[in-house]
Regions:
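Short functional linear segments
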Residues: 1-46, 53-66, 70-72, 107-114
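Beta-strand->loop->alpha-helix junctions that form or flank phosphate-binding loops
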Residues: 72, 198-199, 211-233, 249-254, ...
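Short, flexible loop segments at boundaries between secondary-structure elements
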Residues: 362-365, 431-438
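C-terminal helical cap/extension that packs against the catalytic core
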Residues: 198-220, 235, 303-306, 312, ...
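Nucleotide phosphate-binding/pyrophosphate-handling subdomain across enzymes
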Residues: 38, 133, 138-141, 149-162, ...
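ATP-dependent carboxylate-amine ligase catalytic core
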Residues: 29, 34-37, 63-156, 202
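Hydrophobic alpha-helical packing residues
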Residues: 57-62, 131, 350, 378
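Extended acidic/charged loop-beta regions that coordinate divalent cations
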Residues: 123-173, 205-246
Length: 438
């Protein structure tokens, strides 16, 4: 199996349908020798902030000298981003070797009357297999959706269960109330494990506290209100937390301080599990953390920023950041969304800050909302909206509309940010070549 064949196989598997529950992933991992049982995990669930929190925790653990596996969902640029050790993505060779083994087991499962595992179940099993093969000291694991019935929740060796910000998303699968969604997310907690949760909205907070109490878990609340002397910035942010003074992060967004506080509490909880993490590792890890597509600056003049905000909770955080960082700035949006998201709420929370909104259709996604349909929704509340036919056109038009000191903000779905990153890289390369000819 080569890489192209591997991708074709995964695409084909995506057409087989889904059976809820953990039976398929449990059987697949059993046939693989239950690699997850030989690993230790930090398991992260939440509506928003999972990826950034994973990045902070992983970076700190790496700085402390540990061999750290990372399992990420969704990817932004390239498939192999899903599975990483340290800063290295799984190689095409290892990916193909693992998938070849797993495919044989999947075929045998179907012959034995089991449902074929889904792409996410296969990827999760592949990650477990790979991390065991490479002898990771610890794995930082991000749920795909929810928690209780997520394929990642097969694990039983959780050191710390982490709950990032919980809000309304995936209601079709997780329920229509914050309590129901929180119950799914809190389902990653295992009896007696450490639980670290961000301070949640009251309804979700009650569920988290009740779950931890029922399972005999030690619960720590990471409350950003306890961060002192916070200095916000687009390129650097500093804060004090507990005994740590002047911690520094380079990820932008006021909400990133809350994610960093959560990560600090997680590594302190790991200390209670026997992991040795010095203050110098916490500082170095936080400072060196990078994460694609979270208020990420791609260009200075005009200021071109991409952000993965795609639901109500994330849109509220984005609006807060816009208000804080870009007061009195002229702002142009490039906005693309998926049909199953809370499109009306995202529009309501963000439209007032934009002078001009360009809508796009996220490419190669069956759930994509067409640019013209999104423009119709935006037009109900905002007069200056234009649907454009491609991401290339959106990038070019936004630059024609923007002055040197204006802001171009691209958001609405993580699914197309990788394309935007490549388009901007191509644009900058072309610009540098033109400068070189002068």
């Amino acid at each position: 199996m080569n890489y192209q064949e591997a991708m074709e196989y995964m695409e084909k598997v995506g057409t087989y349908g889904i059976v809820p529950g953990l039976d398929s992933i449990r059987e697949l991992c059993r046939r693989l020798g239950d690699p997850q049982n030989d690993l230790k995990f930090v398991h992260i669930a939440g509506t928003n902030g999972k990826g950034s929190t994973l990045a902070y925790i992983s970076s700190i653990l790496q700085a402390a000298g540990y061999r750290v596996g990372k399992y990420i969902s969704p990817v932004i640029i390239e498939y192999c981003e899903k599975i990483q050790i340290g800063k290295q993505k799984i190689t095409h060779k290892d990916l193909c070797e693992g998938l070849e083994i797993i495919k044989k087991h999947c075929d045998a499962m179907v012959s034995d009357g089991f449902h074929h595992p889904t792409p996410f179940e296969i990827e999760t099993a592949l990650a477990f297999w790979y991390f065991r093969e490479k002898q990771c000291d610890i794995v930082v694991l991000e749920t795909g959706m929810g928690g209780r019935e997520d394929a990642t929740n097969l694990i039983t060796t959780t050191q710390v269960a982490v709950l990032a910000s919980i809000g309304m998303d995936h209601m079709k699968f997780l329920g229509n109330s914050l309590e129901e969604i929180a119950a799914h997310k809190a389902g990653i907690c295992k009896p007696g494990c450490q639980v670290v949760s961000m301070r949640q909205k009251e309804a979700a907070q009650k569920v988290v506290e009740q779950t931890a109490a029922e399972l005999g878990c030690m619960l720590t609340i990471a409350d950003v209100a306890n961060a002192k002397h916070v200095k916000y910035g687009l390129k650097k942010q500093t804060f004090d937390y507990g005994n740590y003074k002047k911690l520094e992060i380079t990820l932008a967004g006021k909400f990133q301080v809350a994610n960093a506080v959560l990560a600090v509490e997680v590594v302190q909880a790991l200390g209670k599990c026997g992991y040795e993490i010095k203050e110098s590792a916490v500082r170095k890890g936080l400072q060196e953390t990078t994460w694609i597509g979270r208020l990420q600056i791609l260009e200075e003049h005009p200021l071109f920023i991409v952000d993965g905000a795609h639901n109500e909770d994330a849109a509220a955080k984005l609006a807060d950041s816009i208000e804080f960082y870009f007061t009195n700035k002229r702002i142009i949006y490039i906005m693309g969304m998926l049909k199953d998201k809370e499109v009306d709420r995202v529009i309501a929370l963000t439209e007032k800050y934009a002078d001009q909104i360009l809508t796009v259709t996220p490419p190669d996604n069956p759930r994509a909302m067409h640019a013209y349909d999104l423009a119709t929704e935006v037009a109900k509340v905002h007069p200056n909206v234009t649907a454009v036919d491609s991401l290339e056109e959106a990038v070019e038009l936004s630059h024609l509309l923007a002055g040197r000191d204006d802001v171009i903000l691209c958001f609405g779905s993580l699914s197309y940010l990788g394309r935007i990153l490549k388009l901007m890289e191509k644009r900058q390369t072309a610009g540098n070549k033109r400068k070189g000819k002068r």
